[in-house]
């Protein structure tokens, strides 16, 4: 085990605070509508230019071990806030730096760090309650667009795209962000349920122009095993043919004689069918087949439920208004399932989401909810160059997270105003002793900091603006983009409540840990091993011609 360097008390804290300041100073220049850019070096290709706080934070790694510890702790604030709320990373970093800076002064003057932390926690809890009171629900398209625009660094086109996507697929729908092929942003919406499996034979295509098979008002047969024997399918095929409607077969696989017979019937026009493989694998495949069954009002024909293919009737088949099957995707539009059953299934999956431990599982479950509840929208980001594309895509993803947070917990006036209002409301808060009161004071001072930084980045005098905003009421604040004092909500400068709340809580949590640190242990730098000597002498004369 390598030797360690152990540093105590003020020496440890001072070094860690230096690291906090280096990281925070690099991140905070990006805050607000007039925030500056930060250029990040790349090991290959051109540098990346960004105004995204968390991207800057993730790049920073310091040489000094103790400084790096401090920087990594604040980096944790940014990433945690990004994970929970999707935005507010720069605000959280600014708050953490302020709490650490003010707190260190009190610790240096001999106050008890534990009492300071108790005071900080008390003030944060009161401020969070106050933010919830100020918050108002975010329901209209206009409000959603405003939140998206602010989060994407005042880019209204991104806000509009996200609002349009949410309008099309609902608040629960899946919205994904991809690289576009043109200069303009595009929005593709898939209504109904889509899964990534296409037709098993191109002979099923009945729309050669689009290269898809379209089934109008079809039955849907769901089976969890392979189908290779046509005899198993015959009874149900005869019933469907009598009904004079097309059929979609979704099974683990359809092969051999069964597939050949279906293709021949299709070509001759006897029975219009399309066969596709079931989506997913293992347990997820079973669950997705069950989802499709509930959406179409049918049943999965499986041995576990006591159903067999030979005995299947039309009652066990699902139905839909229209189904489109392409080479790689199948889309079921307007399934005949009961709304009550679909809602119950969505509720059940939501419970699984809450219990899920891995991000991958959670993401897949959320996709299933969206497919049942709404639809899928894809925002294709357009840009002139690769560098611009990456930067814009990161902003769109941030904005998307922020709008989801706004729909979830509502919105508050932006531009640092909500924290100023919450600060005014809790100004009379007191602790049980002078040290706790100092902790409360630290938070009250920190809550001004985001507004100060926004104003400073805009090149104005921060103290004057903070005093003017604090003297106002309600949504009255400073719009740094125009340099005017306005009603922030009317001007469209709003933040999701969840983002502001999470930023404050995470900043206080990590800053409190830093203030109560009394020793730091870091690995000592390894001394370079001496270079090996040259080859030993006396190698000549070994009978070789040199």
From Swiss-Prot:
BP GO annotations: protein refolding
GO molecular function: ATP binding; ATP-dependent protein folding chaperone; isomerase activity; unfolded protein binding
Protein residues bound to ATP: 30-33, 51, 87-91, 415, 479-481, 495
Cellular compartment(s): Cytoplasm
Family annotation (Pfam families): Cpn60_TCP1
Gly residues biased stretches: 534-546
Reaction catalysed by this enzyme: ATP + H2O + a folded polypeptide = ADP + phosphate + an unfolded polypeptide
A GO term from the CC aspect: cytoplasm
Enzyme class label: isomerase
Keywords for the protein's UniProt record, in alphabetical order: ATP-binding, Chaperone, Cytoplasm, Isomerase, Nucleotide-binding
Ranges for region Disordered: 526-546
Alphabetized InterPro entries for the sequence: Chaperonin_Cpn60_CS, Cpn60/GroEL, Cpn60/GroEL/TCP-1, GroEL-like_apical_dom_sf, GROEL-like_equatorial_sf, TCP-1-like_intermed_sf
Enzyme Commission number(s) of this protein: 5.6.1.7
Subunit structure: Forms a cylinder of 14 subunits composed of two heptameric rings stacked back-to-back. Interacts with the co-chaperonin GroES.
Function: Together with its co-chaperonin GroES, plays an essential role in assisting protein folding. The GroEL-GroES system forms a nano-cage that allows encapsulation of the non-native substrate proteins and provides a physical environment optimized to promote and accelerate protein folding.
Similarity comment: family membership: Belongs to the chaperonin (HSP60) family.
Protein name stated in the entry: Chaperonin GroEL 1
